[in-house]
Amino acid sequence: IFGLAIAYLAILFNLNFVCKNKRLRSLGRLAIPSSVFNINEPLVFGVPTVLNILTFIPSMICVAINLVVAYLSTAAGLMSKTCMSVPWTLPAPLYAFLSTMDYRAIIIWFVLFAINIIVFIPFMKSYDKQMDLEDEKLSEQGE
């Protein structure tokens, strides 16, 4: 619930609202339907998040933050423990609620989502600039 799934949605948010590169924005639009249901392969292989330092580092930071906050929230009684297994393809906030049967899990999920977006912004801006330079090189070679 609170691991990498939130980070992928933060990447998706940044692709659609922070990045200006045409390729990244179109990837962001194309990945929305599948990412809503936790199918993140378009992002994993399209951005890519594997072997790309500008997406790998913030992903690991976000996973650490998400897991620590979720654990501490559960330990402190801010949300209930996970009490049931639900299908992984449910939209993430609904997954958080149904697996804990606690509305506070949704609140914590959205707080973590906002934190993940903030963590990713500088990295995605750098990646956006890198993609722009790549596009310039490709257009120069084509001329």
PLM feature segments, named:
Residues 1, 10-12, 30, 44-143:
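Transmembrane alpha-helical segments and their short flanking loops
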Residues 7-36:
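Membrane-embedded helical hairpins/re-entrant loop segments and their flanking transmembrane helices
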